Amino acid sequence: MSGAILIVGAGPGIGLAAAERFGREGWTVVLAARSPRHLDPMVARLIGEGVDAHGIVLDATDPVAVQAGVRTADRLTGGLTTVLYNAAVVRQQDLFSMTDAEVSADVAVNITGGLNTIRAAESVFADRGGTILVTGGGLAVHPHASYASLGLGKAALRNLVEGLAPDLETRGIRIAVATVATLVAPDSPEATGVAETLWTLASDPSTGWERTYPLAA
């Protein structure tokens, strides 16, 4: 199985691990992030590992930029088969101590960016099918007051994925969420495990709309 994946919100943890996992299968990988300073070293690392990798600077909170970025990645790869939304603001803070600006900024990334990416991916896959993946979180089902904005975002995207999955499936588009119920550091076993979960979701349609990492014992 070969293909091409765009990872929106690529970082040194789950994003890079997923890029390496898909790259090992011969997939073309496009990383998208807001900062070239963080993006360029990741792309260089992938190329050094023999992965056909590209990078594009992209702000997921800008719907026009996301639409353009997805179409650019589609052209770069000769046809995307999967789009992953991986961006998040991880803020350990309760709702009542956050400023209005912090709430708005976190919602823009944790929710709106995901909506923008899902809409853009659907527009590309509408005529040929494809897979849309979302990096979710255990806070979506087990919330904690100290991670108010992150839990809100993960719950919203999980809800959206579950709601969209049946309709999109009838049009040849799969959408699924990897619910990550653990902390993940760069180059960690957890990052590798989440990447494997994402690969399973992309390559095995029988996994349904959600898969949790780590799997319950």
Tell me what each language-model feature is:
Residues 89, 96-115, 157:
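Catalytic Tyr-X3-Lys loop
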Residues 46-64:
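Rossmann-fold cofactor-recognition segment
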Residues 69, 84, 117-121:
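Hydrophobic positions on the long internal alpha-helix
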Residues 27-41:
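Conserved glycine-rich Rossmann-like NAD(P)H-binding loop of the short-chain dehydrogenase/reductase
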Residues 11-12:
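Conserved glycine-rich cofactor-binding loop
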Residues 170-217:
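C-terminal helical subdomain
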Residues 106, 131-156, 169, 184:
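Catalytic loop of short-chain dehydrogenase/reductase
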Residues 75, 109-127:
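Amphipathic alpha-helical dimer-interface segment in Rossmann-like NAD(P)H-dependent oxidoreductases
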